[in-house]
């Protein structure tokens, strides 16, 4: 969606917090939020639905909430949507009828779980690849509703395919809970194509783009 | 079950906005309590995740991979060919590295990684991402003015060095292979790994310090 999350190329956000933002966490609650999110709390969601959920936040909150505050809010939305907790239970911070507790995991189990969690997003497509390495392509001037991974700054721009990754899960469909494969490419754009004549002539920006985002140039 | 209904999700977000105190510590506490009471996770498991990523999984893993690439040309070739397969030689495969790509800095090319749409990061090889990587400033500016961003990190690039910014819009993740620092001839892998900074593997650091 054309939401506030689509930050690439937007101006006015000031300097990067290089020193103050060097650590992953500033507060203990951020640490706990991150740890919570490592477990598959809601097995029926997809990674694209999680991302789309963040995009659907109240725009002012998206911009002013800290990163893990956004995650907490998105998980509460997901809990309510999924029926894990009602809105009243969320407000109370407790469920009416607790379930048997989960068994705790050890650090060694987590390290092994991380290793085993190497997910392959390759998903067969039922069509042959339309583009090849070296082809010039043009991005669509618009995204797809409700979810797209074609950022606004790279729309209606011409670039060169520098890699073809076979077919991967299409996020546009993943956000709807569907498992559809589509060919995925890395496309390189010159900085001047994206930002105009003031950009450095040698600089480039690459994006991973699905085939339905592209047309022949 | 998940509805996958955008309108319903947006309605819930608006409800939370209007009815829930924004205090993030309270929201996380509520979320943790709800998850624990539903039997979805044990509190100790959260601690175990934090410990795993503090003690075992972090940028020291990436640094070991880079040091091997500097000293073993065959490994470097494997890393550039298929980084997901290459890091299994260390047992470092895992979360968010199922499609890992290594990109190499040269005297005329600098690589830098960003995720403008969210905050994608190769967790199993670099650990938890720094807060700046997730900041609106970095996400918005890295693609548009990478040289100005690099200058804020203390990296000044001459005009003869081209910058390529990799915007992680899919499930591919990137690790930058920085240039081996001068004066490190004959160093073993452990000593070389100690010269590799986290930021150099994201591409916001460039010239590493040797001796």
What are these regions (language model features)?
Chain A
Residues 7-37, 79-82, 121-133, 142-217:
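Basic/aromatic-rich interaction segments and small domains that mediate binding to polyanionic partners
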């Amino acid at each position: 969606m054309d939401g506030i999350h689509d930050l690439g190329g937007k101006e006015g956000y000031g300097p990067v917090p290089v020193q103050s933002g060097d650590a992953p966490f500033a507060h203990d609650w951020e640490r706990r939020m991150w740890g919570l999110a490592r477990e598959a709390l809601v097995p029926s969601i997809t990674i694209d639905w999680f991302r789309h959920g963040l995009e659907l936040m109240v725009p002012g909150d998206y911009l002013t909430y800290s990163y893990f505050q956004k995650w907490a809010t998105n998980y509460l939305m997901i809990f309510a949507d999924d029926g894990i907790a009602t809105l009243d239970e969320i407000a109370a911070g407790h469920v009416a009828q607790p379930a048997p507790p989960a068994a705790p995991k050890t650090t060694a189990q987590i390290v092994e779980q991380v290793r085993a969690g190497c997910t392959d997003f390759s998903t067969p497509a039922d069509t042959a690849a339309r583009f090849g390495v070296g082809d010039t392509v043009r991005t669509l001037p618009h995204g797809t509703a409700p979810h797209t991974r074609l950022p606004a700054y790279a729309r209606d721009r011409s670039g060169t395919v520098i890699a073809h990754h076979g077919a991967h899960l299409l996020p546009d469909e993943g956000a709807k809970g569907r498992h559809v494969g589509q060919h995925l490419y890395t496309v390189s754009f010159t900085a001047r194509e994206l930002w105009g004549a003031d950009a450095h002539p040698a600089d480039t920006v690459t994006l991973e783009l699905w085939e339905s985002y592209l047309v022949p140039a | 079950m998940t509805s996958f209904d955008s309108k319903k999700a947006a309605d819930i977000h608006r409800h939370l906005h209007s009815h829930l105190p924004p205090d993030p510590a309270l929201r996380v506490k509520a979320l943790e309590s709800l998850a624990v009471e539903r039997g979805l996770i044990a509190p100790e498991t959260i601690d175990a995740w934090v410990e795993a990523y503090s003690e075992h999984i972090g940028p020291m893993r990436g640094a070991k991979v880079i040091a091997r690439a500097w000293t073993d040309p065959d490994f470097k070739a494997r890393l550039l060919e298929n980084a997901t397969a290459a890091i299994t030689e260390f047992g470092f495969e895992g979360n968010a590295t199922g499609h890992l790509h290594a990109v190499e800095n040269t005297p005329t090319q600098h690589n830098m990684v960003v995720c403008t749409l969210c905050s994608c990061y190769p967790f199993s090889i670099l650990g938890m991402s720094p807060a700046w990587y997730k900041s609106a400033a970095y996400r918005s500016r890295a693609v548009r003015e990478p040289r100005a961003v690099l200058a804020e990190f203390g990296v000044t690039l001459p005009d003869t060095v081209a910058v390529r910014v990799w915007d992680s819009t899919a499930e591919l993740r990137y690790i930058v292979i920085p240039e081996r620092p001068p004066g490190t001839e004959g160093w073993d892998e452990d000593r070389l790994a100690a010269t590799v900074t986290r930021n150099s593997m994201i591409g916001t650091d460039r010239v590493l310090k040797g001796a």
